């Protein structure tokens, strides 16, 4: 089988899902036990949205498959255990939306039976069979059956609202202790009934496709739920860069490059002779400092010593 297609009927005002996750039971082989239940999942991606069910689907499906194959050629392989864990986690988050998609009918290409019996979801198994309505295939459905893909017609049901949320009164605005009057802009009836305005209650049809189903025909569907594209992202573990022992960081406080010469000797010498010129004038203090430098023979101040000798001794 080349592809399987889901045609979802929804209201124009509702948001379509980027992808759907379909879960079904795989046909057992002769070597497998009869009591063993093999459940498989398949991702269906959104190809396009059409306004009528009479639109031919073959061209949209083929174009979407070709585009998807081109994208896969440029994308690395995503088959990893971490991806499977992400899919399972997202499946649990989307369990509340399982009942939103109801399967109406299933059609196989080149089949003797134009319409396969209505397939219900797992939640509809308790409903008596006489309550399940069987729909006859339309002309558009018969036209699409001739294509090389299996077609499922579904309806996106809106969630039931048990408790309607009442609009609360807006906060009162005061100006100088006087209540302000709110004015609302009203839309004229002519604007509401304009031809270019779309009716949100009209129905459109979302076409989803899957080109990688390798287990024969899809049957015994358990559920259909939204699938998040972000689940395919594989988060690679961050590996720290290799650090060699002979490398060091210049910004570290204890790095040998940040060692500065000690100034304790100069500060001790100044503290030792500060008493000689603490209470005297600046000239006497400078002279005491120069005598101290002569005594200890500091080579760093040779220029100052020579100037001092010329001033004192000529």
Curated annotation (Swiss-Prot):
Alphabetically ordered keywords of this record: Cytoplasm, Nucleus, Protein transport, Transport
Transmembrane segments: none
UniProt-annotated stretches for the region Disordered: 243-269
Ranges annotated as biased composition (Acidic residues): 243-253
Domain of life: Eukaryota
Claim: Protein transport is one of the keywords in the record: yes
Residues making up the signal peptide according to the UniProt record: none
Annotated compartments: Cytoplasm; Nucleus
Sections of the chain in a coiled coil: none
UniProt GO BP: protein transport
Pfam families linked to this entry: Iwr1
Any GO CC annotation of this UniProt entry: nucleus
Annotated function: Directs RNA polymerase II nuclear import.
Family from the record: Belongs to the IWR1/SLC7A6OS family.
PANTHER family, A to Z: RNA POLYMERASE II NUCLEAR LOCALIZATION PROTEIN SLC7A6OS-RELATED (PTHR31196:SF2)
Protein name, UniProt field: Probable RNA polymerase II nuclear localization protein SLC7A6OS
Source species of the chain: Xenopus tropicalis
